[in-house]
Amino acid sequence: MRNDWTFKEAKQIFNLPLLELLYKAQTIHRKYFDPNKIQISMLLNIKTGNCPENCGYCSQSSHYKTDLQKEPLVDIDTLISEAKKAKELGSTRFCMGAAWRSPLDKDLKIVCQMIEEVKKLGLETCVTLGFLKEHQIAMLKKAGLDFYNHNMNTSPEFYEHIATTHTFDDRLATLKAVRKFGIKLCSGGIIGLGETIDDRISMLLLLATLEEQPESVPINRFVKVAGTPLNPQSDIDPFDFVRIIALTRILMPKSYIRLAAGREQMSDELQTLCFMGGANSIFYGGRLLTTDGPQPEQDDLLFQKIGLEKVQTICH
């Protein structure tokens, strides 16, 4: 497995004839994964809104007036109940997101309890909590955390157009710090923020050339939220989106590639092309933080139509 890809190589792959690109991605995908299996993750917002960061796409930022209802950290009993529901629906991983720049230690202690309780249910755990200090990463490691999510979102060149309260390098430093503690990484991006195709390739290339590639790579389609400033003038070309999925599979052959936000706006046919291109995971359950997703019965019907089966065991 390579982590010395060049931009020139990646762009040449992206620009292959689409059917050739899909064939190449699917061939690589089959070396490492069962092409008829899909991993299911479910995500719970454990603390909603009032985030001090100014990410221009995000409904949870305190900088913008949105319809979002702010909510404090959920209680442990609610968390356990939601995790049990996730397991019943076929999820193997339970993800917990909190709208913080950085957690306070007193709040992180509660999150660590949550991790321990979810692990008791036989589920993998993932959290996304913002920027962390080293002693906080150690706390998460001790609690048994499997994955830490910290998306790079876009290229270093475009980053200042989506957020100015922190930098691209801040995010990258967090990824590297978490990895030092042996916690698996979940990191991807958002397509459709107004970035160029070169920006998309640059973002993927950064992840693919890390010393250890992320084990999970969520790819989000931008969803416009009323009240937030980002409002790209053009829609995402569906074939370009499929190309990004296929390029991700080729650059990161062992990673789970997850279709994340924006699936509500994707047709069954487009999602199926993404699965052909190497996507093998979704966020499931009708809600992704503050945006809507397909209902479980919609996804189950699609899986039935195309012959996909949910992975039944924890994925490592």
From Swiss-Prot:
Its cofactor is [4Fe-4S] cluster; [2Fe-2S] cluster. One of its GO terms (biological process) is biotin biosynthetic process. Residues 36-260 form the Radical SAM core domain. Keywords: 2Fe-2S, 4Fe-4S, Biotin biosynthesis, Iron, Iron-sulfur, Metal-binding, S-adenosyl-L-methionine, Transferase. It comes from Lawsonia intracellularis (strain PHE/MN1-00). This is Biotin synthase. [4Fe-4S] cluster binds at C51, C55, C58. GO terms for molecular function: 2 iron, 2 sulfur cluster binding; 4 iron, 4 sulfur cluster binding; biotin synthase activity; iron ion binding. [2Fe-2S] cluster binds at C95, C126, C186, R258. Catalyzes the conversion of dethiobiotin (DTB) to biotin by the insertion of a sulfur atom into dethiobiotin via a radical-based mechanism. Homodimer. Pathway: Cofactor biosynthesis; biotin biosynthesis; biotin from 7,8-diaminononanoate: step 2/2. Belongs to the radical SAM superfamily. Biotin synthase family. It catalyses: (4R,5S)-dethiobiotin + (sulfur carrier)-SH + 2 reduced [2Fe-2S]-[ferredoxin] + 2 S-adenosyl-L-methionine = (sulfur carrier)-H + biotin + 2 5'-deoxyadenosine + 2 L-methionine + 2 oxidized [2Fe-2S]-[ferredoxin]. Binds 1 [4Fe-4S] cluster. The cluster is coordinated with 3 cysteines and an exchangeable S-adenosyl-L-methionine. NCBIfam families: bioB (TIGR00433). It is an enzyme of class 2 (transferase). Its EC number is 2.8.1.6. Coiled coil: none annotated. Signal peptide: none annotated.
